[in-house]
Amino acid sequence: MREKWVRAFAGVFCAMLLIGCSKSDRPQMGNAGGAEGGDFVVGMVTDSGDIDDKSFNQQVWEGISRFAQENNAKCKYVTASTDAEYVPSLSAFADENMGLVVACGSFLVEAVIETSARFPKQKFLVIDAVVQDRDNVVSAVFGQNEGSFLVGVAAALKAKEAGKSAVGFIVGMELGMMPLFEAGFEAGVKAVDPDIQVVVEVANTFSDPQKGQALAAKLYDSGVNVIFQVAGGTGNGVIKEARDRRLNGQDVWVIGVDRDQYMDGVYDGSKSVVLTSMVKRADVAAERISKMAYDGSFPGGQSIMFGLEDKAVGIPEENPNLSSAVMEKIRSFEEKIVSKEIVVPVRSARMMN
């Protein structure tokens, strides 16, 4: 995969950052890694959920673990449960002189800014957010607006096939990079049919499957037949609602996020309610930059964009629920995005108002 070094996007991304959260559990710690005796250690701090959330955190952990296994290194993680625990969690790893400390998501931006100033020799990686003007911090961001455009095309085509005039979008929280998903999804939908509406629901949490299921029920009851969920653990509830309704004979679909969630939607043999997924290779970013830190080529102070032309975002290689005609349409749009014939927006119409 090829990475593009970009500073132009940093200002846009930073303008999106909204910091803050509220969680209730105490930090949970764990470890994994290569053979005993490895001196290089990567420490990962999550901002919501755990490393088995079937979404973003799990992807990052898989990338770090893969790096550790291949380089005789080790890795540890801590789940910081409140904003008050972010700085202590990062600082605890920095006190151990980690080879790299990885912060997952935009909740941790302010904590990374503070901690990186206190520990100028410690290398930090913040994933899916931007920290500027810190020589010991690398920011990995993704063109999820580009990947979301493609699943927007799939959603709109499925809606038109069913005679529907709207599709659904459920987001965990409107912060950090999250607006990019809605912007790209809406643009993809409108590229197919400008008259199809995107109905948005905000869960205000990434870790409440029951809330996700309730919001999905609301959208499906309104007549929507396809929902794109971008909500971490909350999104698992969206998938569950789709599975339950399919078992009751309703023709509804859900679009996964971050990784291929087809298997999460299986409800009858090998049948799945997951139409497709907006895959974001956070694991590749985590593995790649961990290796750079290990090799002594850590690009401190840089923001690295992983986009569609890098094959870091997009749809899975296999899409059993998409016809060849739909795939052909999606690939056509993909080529236009990569060639810059189509420039995908970073804000939706709703966000612009």
Swiss-Prot record:
Record's bilayer topology term: Lipid-anchor
InterPro entries: BMP_lipoprotein, Peripla_BP_I, PnrA-like
UniProt xrefs under PROSITE patterns: PROKAR_LIPOPROTEIN
Binding annotation for inosine: D47, N57, D128, G232, D258, K280
UniProt keyword list: Cell membrane, Lipoprotein, Membrane, Palmitate, Signal, Transport
Entry binding sites for adenosine: D47, S48, F56, D128, F206, G232, D258, K280
Signal peptide as annotated in the record: 1-20
Compartments in which it is found: Cell membrane
Induction, as annotated: Encoded in an operon with TP_0320, TP_0321, TP_0322 and TP_0323 that may code for an ABC-type nucleoside uptake system, with TP_0322 and/or TP_0323 encoding putative permeases, and TP_0319 encoding a ligand-binding protein.
Main location: membrane
Lipidation (S-diacylglycerol cysteine): C21
Recorded consequence of changing C21S: Loss of lipid incorporation and cleavage at alternative processing site
UniProt-listed SUPFAM superfamilies: Periplasmic binding protein-like I (SSF53822)
Binding, guanosine: D47, N57, D128, F206, G232, D258, K280
Any one Gene Ontology cellular component term annotated for this protein: plasma membrane
Lipid positions (N-palmitoyl cysteine): C21
UniProt xrefs under CDD domains: Periplasmic_Binding_Protein_type1
Function: Binds purine nucleosides and may play a role in purine nucleoside uptake. May be part of an ABC-type nucleoside uptake system. Has highest affinity for guanosine, followed by inosine and adenosine. Has very low affinity for cytidine and does not bind thymidine.
Record-stated family: Belongs to the BMP lipoprotein family.
PANTHER family, per the entry: ABC TRANSPORTER GUANOSINE-BINDING PROTEIN NUPN, TRANSCRIPTIONAL ACTIVATOR PROTEIN MED
UniProt subunit comment: Monomer.
Protein name: Membrane lipoprotein TmpC
Organism: Treponema pallidum (strain Nichols)
Taxonomic path: Bacteria, Pseudomonadati, Spirochaetota, Spirochaetia, Spirochaetales
Gene name tied to this protein: tmpC
